[in-house]
Amino acid sequence: MVQRISLKNKLLPDLVEIQRASFKWFLLEGLTEVLEIFPKISDPTSRLELQLFGNEYKIKFPRYSVRQAKNRDKTYSAQIYVPAKLTRKDIDLPSKNQEKNIKSLDLSSTHLQLSAEKQIKNKKYKKRLVFIGDLPIMTNRGTFIVSGTERVIINQIIRSPGIYYKQEIDKNGKQIYSASLISNRGSWLKFEIDPKGEIWIRIDKTHKVNAYIFLRAIGLNKDEIEKGLSKYAFLISASQIYSVKELAKEIGKNNIEEVTDEEALLIVYSKLRPNEPATVAVAKQMLYSRFFDPKRYDLGEVGRYKINKKLGLNIPKTFRVLSPQDILSSIDYLINIKDKNSGNLDDIDHLGNRRVRSVGELLQNQFRVGLNRLERIIRERMMICDIDSLSLSNLINPKPLIASVREFFGSSQLSQFMDQTNPVAELTHKRRISALGPGGFNKDRAGFAVRDLHPSHYGRICPIETPEGPNAGLIGSLATCARVNVFGFIETPFYPVNQGQVIYHNSPVYLTADEEDDFRVAPGDVKVSKQHYIEGDIIPVRYRQEFITTTPTQVDYIAISPIQVISAATSLIPFLEHDDANRALMGSNMQRQAVPLLYPEKPIIGTGLETKIARDSGMVVISRTSGHVNYVSANKIGIQDNSGRTVHYRLKKYYRSNQDTCINQRPIVWVGEKIVVGQTLADGASTDGGEIALGRNILVAYMPWEGYNYEDAFLISERLVYDDLYTSIHIEKYEVECRQTKLGPEEITREIPNVSDNSLKDLDRNGIVVGGSWVEAGDILVGKITPKGEADQLPEGKLLRAIFGEKARDVRDTSLRLPNAAKGRVVKVRVFTRQKGDELPPGTNAMIRVYVAQKRKIQVGDKMAGRHGNKGIISRILPKQDMPYLSDGTPVDIVLNPLGVPSRMNVGQVFECLLGLAGGYLGKRFKIIPFDEMYGAEASRALVNRKLKEASLITSNKWLFNDQHPGKMQVFDGRTGEPFDNPVTVGRAYMLKLVHLVDDKIHARSTGPYSLVTQQPLGGRAQHGGQRLGEMEVWALEAFGAAYTLQELLTVKSDDMQARNEALNAIVKGKPIPKPGTPESFKVLMRELQSLGLDIAVHKLKLFEDGQRRTVEVDLMSDSKDNRVDRSNYDTPPVDDFEQFLY
């Protein structure tokens, strides 16, 4: 097993290679490719010509380093310069006399041409470098810094360009055969044979044209069609119904074979543009631009490769538009499927038909869009502006390209704010594969087939790691050993097998899903002898998407490892094969949410990939040279290499991550230590000794305890709090801008009106909090005053100044204060001003950023989880002495509910905790590879029992292993000291503290902001909102008959503005609370109905003096104290009433 783990680590690729390799391809090939197809642009008179030399582009060194870009909110980018040449052609037009002489002379055309050439004087200009835009540069960790934040471009999996054949059933239950020809860019073509046997070609899913007519229109004559089709008679007979019904109407012919090329072109044009007059030249141009023009249509290298492979063609891969041969062969293949049942139908969900677009290709497409905009702008300028005044600088405007790239990085679905909670989250984010985004699926319309697992996913896309919500199956993760080839297809490695013997000495063979289909492939957990022969008579294999069995001699390939099927995060789960897939999915996803702890600890039970994942995530510092350590401090490590040169490595100290967790690197080498290339020099967040350390190994017991672990709740010992086992640091960023207002500039100052000296104790002389200060909710971080206008001032202030003529400072306090429920230590203060050379937004004079670090101990309400999907909320923290304890007096750290195991079927947690217990007593750590049945039946159970027995013998603790109840032991109640009735499963499990902390979620409101329109309290913690009393809560109160409580909740406590104020006064003065009025939201509803033209009003019955009851309209919009006149009705008044206004 040890040998297999070391071998596997060598075979694992660099886990972030998919990002780096793609961006490298973009810089070397992708950008050149898109710049080279930029056309020569001439003005309408052909006097001016612009040419770009894309293959000679230059990239300037980035202006800011990665660290500076992050600190200053800048983009880590480089400027792109392209050599360009602007050529002016001065044409001397001949005079009238010269024209007469030319006409009278009988000269040959060649002579005329030569004389015209002499009159054109070319003014050639040298090539000059022109700035065309900024390109964000990828950091060595595979991320981009955009406006100071770290972002990741995730990989997109889309339908590959090519041709796909399928068989469908129409609504009448009859079969339809169709073929879709999908391009990378341009129109789609669909060939179909309908239930009547007619062959049609659909262009862009709408316009339908007869197949024979289309073949004639693209320039094939009758003989070429007959020669190219093996079933020419089928095509002609399929067109008979069309000939009789439609052809006669269109061109007056009954035989389709008599149609000429020109007639066919006009028919196709009339179908595509039915309301436009058709000419042969226009029709030809339109058809050419649709399918044969490289600017408008592109199959891509992949599309050409797939079409050649499917149809058996030998068209060069550089020919990336359609050829008549493609269309003819496509129809021939379709007829053969229908008529002979030869040829293969395609499965669109097969990974051979789906390809990955990584960052390089996505950026290339965005550059193409930007360059198209640039071309359009250049042409417009050439037409509008005076040609003599044009130069390269005012012709080529970098803005369209800059805007296009900014749009992609800022708002594309595939450009995401990096998940930096811990190294696993970071690495998984870079290896994520999404079927969403431009050109992909929509999560609302994606069906089950797209989301489902497919046999071709084996070793390519992880079957376990995917989200739980509406994106399930649409977002996945690349498997550990998978890589993406030049065409974008995912490959996975296999060892070849020859006559039952596995050939290990060669490098493994990487196969795509298409190539793998033709071979019998055995899984990685098949037992192999020391002589490398496959053991056993019957071997399970995959062959042509089916799971079958065969003999060892018939096996063609074998998987290199059992973990090549799963993703990096899933491969960290030990005993994975004993967990239900749903729970393993939760375990994989929750590892990404684990908060980096103050004192991380590597797991006793691992899988062997912890070191690889920590290294590839970029969280640890790795030596680039061999040598010895000559300097170590908390901030820097110096390594002297063999040539005597010292290389310094700067460490990150208390950096804030995107998720407000703390990134802090700690040296793990000492002065004088010898170092080799690739050795880990410093640990980062969630790493310990160069290995991933997301949580802690703690003692768990599976037993009920007074109902405190009901419904997955956890009961924990106060040891976890006092010993800081689950304490984490969180760093919040607070920012304030000092702006230039109409009334004057805002000021950062210590002189704040109406503030006590005690509130200013932590501020320096400029009014900014001092680093290292302890601050609590409401404390001033930055003192700021804003000029106040006359309108802002209170009436008493105006009166005082009117009387005494006193000109007090007309300012108001707009200081930055620490928000509610926050406290901590100020770790960093950054001040940005123009005087220091910082770039600030217009109207901003200064910007101050304060970073506050907070230590959060574990508490009731925090969420914890294991690696097997066993999650729960802490319900109670018990004193150490009250916790159940073992026979040697060790108190348990956490009590879990045993009922959480059987129904969830995640038995891996039991194996893990028991082997962890043995490892804790033996002082050993174990690396367990999943799928260990190759070592024999019940291998996991045998290993756990053996190690427990070994631990009980070595430590002389016989209670550790009980033959009658293996894995269970006597546990005592900490409160009484008496043993519990039954033996209890106790072990050492690896538990994580998740980012869902109660401090970030707990919320209460007494008074707060209200919505302007409805006058109801706002919702949500961020807005300091209230809890919504919704429909169902109203039903509950109605059912209970709590009428007055309900009325109060719907009026005074909600949106009855007048009653709200009156109630407050009544409470203050100790008077009875008055009756509520009409809620504001009811008035809004009334106004909305009135705005629709409905005469809607509220009436009340009133008793008049004559003893009659009549309805009187109530004006809800007026204050109840106002005696306003009732709203008039809409009856027309008599004419007499208007006579007084006539004169």
Swiss-Prot record:
Its EC number is 2.7.7.6. GO terms for cellular component: chloroplast; DNA-directed RNA polymerase complex; mitochondrion. It catalyses: RNA(n) + a ribonucleoside 5'-triphosphate = RNA(n+1) + diphosphate. One of its GO terms (biological process) is DNA-templated transcription. SUPFAM superfamilies: beta and beta-prime subunits of DNA dependent RNA-polymerase. The keyword Transport does not apply. It holds the Pfam family RNA_pol_Rpb2_6. GO terms for molecular function: DNA binding; DNA-directed RNA polymerase activity; ribonucleoside binding. Keywords: Chloroplast, DNA-directed RNA polymerase, Nucleotidyltransferase, Plastid, Transcription, Transferase. Gene3D superfamilies: 2.40.50.100, 2.40.50.150, 3.90.1100.10, DNA-directed RNA polymerase, beta subunit, external 1 domain (2.30.150.10), DNA-directed RNA polymerase, subunit 2, domain 6 (2.40.270.10), RNA polymerase alpha subunit dimerisation domain (3.90.1800.10), RNA polymerase Rpb2, domain 2 (3.90.1110.10). It is found in: Plastid, Chloroplast. Belongs to the RNA polymerase beta chain family. DNA-dependent RNA polymerase catalyzes the transcription of DNA into RNA using the four ribonucleoside triphosphates as substrates. In plastids the minimal PEP RNA polymerase catalytic core is composed of four subunits: alpha, beta, beta', and beta''. When a (nuclear-encoded) sigma factor is associated with the core the holoenzyme is formed, which can initiate transcription. This is DNA-directed RNA polymerase subunit beta.
